């Protein structure tokens, strides 16, 4: 149960982030400072911008939630994110900075013409907006749990916090806020891990899992009958199936390489080396946070039961195991751990940190959407805006509109539907950006614009069709294959023309 001490901790974290957001605004004098930090950001600001967005609700609350049911396989989100950052730093950083553009769609537009850029900008913005929407939903849920307010009020509070986080300082705000959030997140993760370790180490948790789930009514409602099945489900990186779990990791890798926000951090670096180090630092620091979430999720599995599980056990005429904390749903795993097992002040700080984790993801992504809309769509029509104070005002205003629109959509759409759209978001981003950008960087001038436009349309169309038809596998990979085939056809066609 929330207490006054919990609220003091939450408010302290929110006040700290608000201060960082307004302080970072002093470093912004033009649109370049806002969108790419004026190319003056150091290693930690680059890393903070990347991690501030990547380490969102899925990396923390979502990891603990998945670990509650599937143990180690919950690591794929943060593991895939880390590998994506590794490739971003080792392979993409220098080519992106040397491209002469400040957006991924700008890279595509320069190589394949303005029409390819326009089409890609619209589709990519839609994909990123869906992710912003998901983060607003998560933040609203957290706020409605922490504070006794209605969902609409919680939604408005969430976007106000996001605005403080990024709208004043842009990349500086996302980067500085990301560094602060990283420090807080590591602190609460380490403390959470220590608490779990002191109460029950790994061997004891495995033993408790076997006792709770092997040949028991609770195990039966989860499809587990033997201790071997329990160990396989909780101590296996591919517990949900190799195609699903490894596919999830690959989706994250492609998503990191195909999202404006993370590339924006690369352009913000003061040099190629700084940008590379920032991405590599992110690659090193993201996966351990997932491990802490896994420990907490497995620990809570041995101490909690969901309302749905209680109902299923009672419906089967069995006795509900005593001494377990009831959770309304598995999304409450991490918050429940904080409230029940952490000291109150530390628990409040942790809840505030989790809220900011979700907020940081939404604010960073909204910055990416705004940059694409202004620099890749509006300024292509009104070039006089480029480099003016009006450009900065326009980017800030676009961020505010994106956040407001996300609240409106959230209030008019069921959350389950929004969660399903999360998969579509990742697919849209990667299918639009990944292959065309790679070809623009490494095969520049060797593929005609008509082929690029075809690939940019065919890729996301495949993702949309796959989601509508509910394919049993991730349609993203088919779409990547379609894009690759189209671009390779363009490469062959270009070679034939030049050889004639």
Name what the model sees in each region.
Residues 1-23, 449-500:
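A generic transmembrane alpha-helix motif of multi-pass inner-membrane proteins
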Residues 1-60, 166-169, 188, 192:
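Membrane-interface "cap" regions at the ends of multi-pass membrane proteins
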Residues 2, 39, 45, 62-72, ...:
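Loop-to-helix junctions at membrane interfaces in multi-pass transport proteins
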Residues 2-25, 37, 41, 65-106, ...:
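Extracellular loop-to-transmembrane helix junctions
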Residues 20, 24-27, 129-136, 144, ...:
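Hydrophobic alpha-helical segments and their helix-loop junctions in multi-pass secondary transporters
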Residues 31, 101-105, 109, 170-180, ...:
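Hydrophobic, small-residue-rich membrane helices and short re-entrant helix-turn-helix hairpins
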Residues 75-169, 251-255, 356-363:
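Helix-loop-helix module between adjacent transmembrane segments
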Residues 114-118, 374-414:
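Loop-to-transmembrane helix boundary motifs in multi-pass membrane proteins
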